Amino acid sequence: MRLARIIVHLVVIAAAMAAPARAASGQHAGGDSLVVSTAWLAARLGDPSVVVLHVGHGDSYDKAHIPGARALPYREVVTRRDALGSELPPADRLRALLERLGVSDSTRVVVYGDEPPMATRVLFTLDYLGHERISLLDGGLPQWRAERRPVTRDRPRVARGRLTPRIRPEVVAGADWLQAHLGEPGIALVDTRTDGEYLGAGERHGMPSAGHLPGARQLEWEQLFRDGTHLLRDRDELRRLFADRVAPGATVVTYCWVGYRASATYLVARYLGYPARMYDGSYQDWSQRKLPVRGGAAP
């Protein structure tokens, strides 16, 4: 008996030591993680508790999609408001859309898109609605196809879902909120745009100003992904990218031009355990309000 207790004790210690090692390996977690692998999804195709959304433009869904995936045109998850072209639609409209796609309160929603920010914008929207069971498909459809997994052109039959929105206003940052909190040590403002846009040397797109919000540090969203793919960098690499720009425990607030690219950085911030918000109106809103901006490389 004493020997048996010793063996059990050693097994428990070994398991405890192995868990941090797995977390530090850079492998993305499955199950309840914000990021799931193609293998994780492949093992659950046909599971009625998992809804897969293919977010895109045009006819990309009809050309090829993951079996069972439902088509979600990107234009349906954004709306135009106050001269801003990419804002959150009303909650009732979003609920009706998602219920039509078969999403219920207990559904695990796995999302991929023609571009990574299409998927992450939908995940941000689901987060805003308070739907907790959400995941990004790491690698998206390109990785799925590279692994020779099945695709189809068939549209699945979808039973209507029943979704209860539980709005989380704390994941959204507006201009007034930002003006009240800029410069606070617990707020890390992250500009997810290109070098030219951040420096103020890029195209203004008709806006009255160019540059970045005061105090913002740049982390272009594409740096979060392996070059030319929809695959996120390993978790340790992502942590290093954020550690260079975000103090431990700070709330990450992301923005881009219209709240599209910023959603990718928002999602990764959450994946790494940071509290996060996204400025939905982003630079377009800030510039139209003629609020202060900075040019050059300094935050």
Where are these regions (language model features)?
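Bacterial N-terminal signal peptides
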Residues: 7-19
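Thiolate-centered catalytic microenvironments shared by cysteine-dependent enzyme domains
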Residues: 86-181, 202, 211, 261-282
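C-terminal soluble interaction/assembly domains
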Residues: 240, 249-298
